[in-house]
Amino acid sequence: MSKENIFVTKPTLPPLNDLIPYLEKIWETRVLTNGGEFHQKFEAALCDYFGVHHICLFTNATIALVTALQALRITGEVITTPYSFVATSHALLWNGIKPVFVDIDPHSLNLDPARIESAITPHTTAIMPVHCYGHPCDVNGIQRIADNYNLKIIYDAAHAFGVQDAGGSILRYGDLSVLSFHATKVFNTFEGGAIICPDEKTKVRIDQLKNFGHVGETTVVAPGINGKMSEFNAALGLLQLQHIDSALACRQKIDEAYRLKLAGIPGISCIQGSGECVANYAYFPILVHEDYFLTRDTLYNLMKEKGIHPRRYFYPLISQFPMYRGLSSAHPDNLPVALDISQKILCLPIYPDLEMSVVDVICQLIANPC
């Protein structure tokens, strides 16, 4: 094992020389943003890759979440998970919406449909679940509840690039799904995001909202924002699509190696999938139970001392941050599963060029930490 630090992820990039022709085209046309040629081609390529009909590109997924809520005119209260990156709930606050936290399923770590109905009030207008670690939510269970109460569903699918169930991409569920192309994701455009739309009318509204609310040169129909993806990011995305399948295949091998080598270690369990037919292996989360040799945080610090940098995704819970902890739904008694998982979770390094020898060292350290 080399002396360099091993982080939880490393951005996947194409060969630099392959990017040069794209840059030359941008320099030639001087079209840098506002829906240029690469933007249009990237949208079309993603629609083809996912098997969907409409997609809107964004500068990042947080702005996409904010805009998705605005596009569907969501107000009042939205039921969501406390077990996610904080941007999920921040998008609600940016829209003046009250998050209502519901506990997670102990196996999938996604929003637990059995707990949603009791959290619905006359002010509830939507549900915002997260496909945590790229493992699909109980989409049918959530949809039944939404249909019964006339609620919208916006999926935070930041982790779910390329994930499929038996019917195809999981991005087809809900009213909208939001993707992240951040540098830490399995597919990146440096920064970026997207909204998968159900129809042309919704796409047009979202495209207007991400362009300040403009319709033409002289008409503004809504207080929109600048959420447009640049031509550079779109060009990079087009190139990245050529390499994504091989990158996911590499991730799968690392995932399989971890599962094999960690099997049988007392107090360590690996998170399983939740029904996906095609996974993306975006994360490798383990749970450090009470019968392990060390506490989770002691193991975490020991690994960092050895130059290995796992992450505690997601600790602390969103509901424990100052802007949320005053909500009645944020009380720990309301979220026992999420709280328990957050104190046991540890995400191990995984990225396409992670050497198997490093995986061996990580697993040996977990097996024999003392």
Predicted regions mapped to residue ranges:
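N-terminal "arm"/small-domain region of PLP-dependent enzymes with the aminotransferase-like
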Residues: 1-32
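Phosphate-binding glycine-rich loop
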Residues: 31, 35-77, 83, 91-94, ...
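PLP-dependent aminotransferase class I/II
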Residues: 37-45, 49-53, 114, 118, ...
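Structural detector of well-ordered beta-strand residues that form the stable sheet scaffold
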Residues: 56, 79, 100, 153-154, ...
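PLP-dependent aminotransferase-like
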Residues: 70-157, 164
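Glycine-/small-residue-rich active-site loops that bind phosphorylated ligands and cofactors
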Residues: 84, 107-108, 134, 185, ...
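Conserved active-site segment immediately N-terminal to the catalytic lysine
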Residues: 155-189, 204, 216-221
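Short beta-strand-to-turn element immediately C-terminal to the catalytic PLP-Schiff-base lysine
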Residues: 179-180, 193-199, 238
